[in-house]
Every structure is written in structure tokens, then in C-alpha cells.
């Protein structure tokens, strides 16, 4: 990821500072004490008390993550799926049987896909989960059976291009959509819109 940099000569030169997680999103400098910095990055929050020479991480102390998206199945109780910045994809059960104001806390489990994945769940069988990962990786998984690390059996259903079509290109969060008329039909967005009639 991108490093955090500082200039001490008005922007003529820059130097990377800190040994911390990359991809920085926010930096706050205390207006009353410029030695005190708070940095928000893909790994969480880090704090410096000496203008960035040393940083204190809170990765194991703050239970926070950044979800890219959320999808859910049609079961009762239902499962919600999401991809998390730098932490892969997760799923959890949402039980509304006691009311919306009494949803019990649930531990998240591993889910198909990675940090930049979108999910589509078969409405006929909530154990069939499609994940479109970053840069065009598509898989179909059966989440009813997982290995010791919590990973579901999956098969790649990434579209294949002909020789004249070049390389398959996709976005960071490549879209995958299941037809509302026929759950066997999938649409995937790359440099072309792909359609599968048979679940990939």
C-alpha cells in the first residue's frame, strides 16, 4: 500500500515515515500540539506523540473493520456476507426472531471471496454463494461444508475469452448479479458484460 510521507522543507522533498499498515485515508494533527497525530489507514488507527517518528497501533485493541458491501441470503434466520478491507470476506447469522431491537451478537465466519469481493446467494439454496473478487476472479462455493480453516469448497467460474478478445479485465469490486427471473443466470461486469445461463 501507499506509505505515509512528510515534508519538512515546504514540499521540496518527502520522506516515508512510520512502520505501519499502508493505504492511508485520514490524518489528524492536533492544532494545539503538532506532535500528536492520529492516522486512519486500511489496518485501523495509529497514533504518534512525536510528529510521526514512532507510532502506536491499535489493531488488536479496537474491534473495527471497514466493510465494502453487504449481501444476504433468503433463509430464516438469514446470513449476511461482506468483504472487509484487508481482512477477506466474512459472514454471520442475523436472527430477528426476538425482534429487530434484540438481535444477538454473532461471531463472523470466513466467507468465499477476498477483501474486494461482491457476493450473490442462490435464493433456492442459501449454501450456494457466488463471489466476484478483485480483478475478475469469480467462484461458486458450497458453504455447507468448510475445511479446518473455515474455507468453503469452491470452483472457479471466471469467464474465458477467445484469443482475439485479449485479457479479461475487471474492476477492484467487479459486479456479479444473479437474475431475479432465473437464479441459474448470472451477469458479470468486466470490459464486457458476461452472461452465464448455467450457474457459471
Residue ranges and their predicted role:
Residues 1-200:
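Beta-propeller blade termini and top-face loops
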